[in-house]
């Protein structure tokens, strides 16, 4: 049986806690008591952050999405590929010239925030003529961000640049290579290869264990799956 007096005593002895919030713009503020009204007067503003998850353990390799394409998809394939050279990585992978060359990555889909494209035509003189075809789609790693509305543009770029005679590869990266890029690639597998969400997520994690779409993105992927009528 619950002892109300004991619970009341424990509650009175509890220490006041401070909760830190970060909004989509990167503004950080602290609330002294989460049970109190979250008003402007109850907030303590902190230093701003970048507005995205910062990767504290940089890695500079692109990870291939290992998948066997179903024969039914190959039979109705408009891209003429027998394998898909899709890669995922962090922003560091997008700067690794040697790795990009070794993996025949000719195109990069940049879905991060504030990340420069290094191997552009304008920079070819300082990169020994090495040129990458880029597409920038800015996506915030925020649970309230509508990522579904970005899918079509991402799919179009991937379809336009993947495969070919040389079976060129495409790297999809964000800042940390964890949430945004994973969500885009999962949605692509769902849409183009008819692979259910759960299996698509498993495929991404087997290629790059760090992959973890935020909860808001996962909810949107569930909605997207229902729209695809699996």
Swiss-Prot record:
List the active site.
174
Q: Name one GO biological process term.
A: regulation of JNK cascade
* A GO term from the CC aspect: cytoplasm
Q: Return the SUPFAM superfamilies for the record.
A: (Phosphotyrosine protein) phosphatases II
Would I find Repeat among this entry's keywords?
Answer: no
InterPro entries, from UniProt? Dual-sp_phosphatase_cat-dom, Prot-tyrosine_phosphatase-like, Tyr_Pase_AS, Tyr_Pase_dom, TYR_PHOSPHATASE_DUAL_dom
What's its catalytic activity?
A: O-phospho-L-tyrosyl-[protein] + H2O = L-tyrosyl-[protein] + phosphate; O-phospho-L-seryl-[protein] + H2O = L-seryl-[protein] + phosphate; O-phospho-L-threonyl-[protein] + H2O = L-threonyl-[protein] + phosphate
Provide the top EC class. Answer: hydrolase
What would be one Pfam family of this protein?
DSPc
Q: Where is the Tyrosine-protein phosphatase domain?
A: 78-230
Q: Which Gene3D superfamilies match?
A: Protein tyrosine phosphatase superfamily
Does the UniProt entry include the keyword Hydrolase?
Answer: yes
- Look up the EC number in the record and give it: 3.1.3.16, 3.1.3.48
Keywords annotated in UniProt = Hydrolase, Protein phosphatase
GO molecular function term, any single one: JUN kinase phosphatase activity
Domain of life assignment: Eukaryota
Describe its function. Has a dual specificity toward Ser/Thr and Tyr-containing proteins.
The record's comment on protein family reads: Belongs to the protein-tyrosine phosphatase family. Non-receptor class dual specificity subfamily.
This protein is called: Probable dual specificity protein phosphatase DDB_G0283417
Species this chain originates from: Dictyostelium discoideum (Social amoeba)
């Amino acid at each position: 049986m619950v002892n109300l007096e004991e619970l009341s005593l424990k509650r009175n002895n509890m220490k006041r806690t401070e909760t830190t919030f970060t909004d989509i713009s990167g503004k950080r503020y602290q609330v002294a008591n989460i049970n109190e009204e979250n008003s402007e007067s109850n907030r303590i503003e902190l230093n701003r952050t970048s507005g995205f998850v910062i990767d504290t353990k940089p890695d500079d390799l692109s990870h291939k999405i290992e998948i066997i394409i179903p024969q039914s998809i190959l039979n109705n394939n408009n891209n003429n590929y027998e394998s898909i050279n899709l890669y995922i990585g962090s922003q560091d992978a997008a700067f690794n010239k040697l790795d990009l060359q070794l993996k025949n990555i000719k195109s990069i889909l940049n879905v991060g925030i504030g990340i420069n494209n290094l191997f552009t035509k304008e920079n070819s003189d300082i990169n020994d003529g090495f040129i990458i075809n880029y597409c920038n789609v800015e996506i915030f790693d925020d649970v309230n961000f509508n990522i579904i509305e970005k899918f079509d543009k991402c799919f179009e770029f991937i379809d336009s640049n993947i495969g070919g005679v040389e079976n060129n590869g495409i790297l999809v990266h964000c800042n940390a290579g964890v949430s945004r890029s994973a969500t885009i690639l999962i949605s692509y597998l769902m849409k183009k290869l008819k692979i259910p969400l759960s299996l698509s997520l498993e495929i991404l994690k087997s290629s790059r264990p760090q992959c973890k779409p935020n909860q808001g993105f996962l909810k949107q992927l569930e909605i997207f799956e229902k729209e695809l009528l699996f």
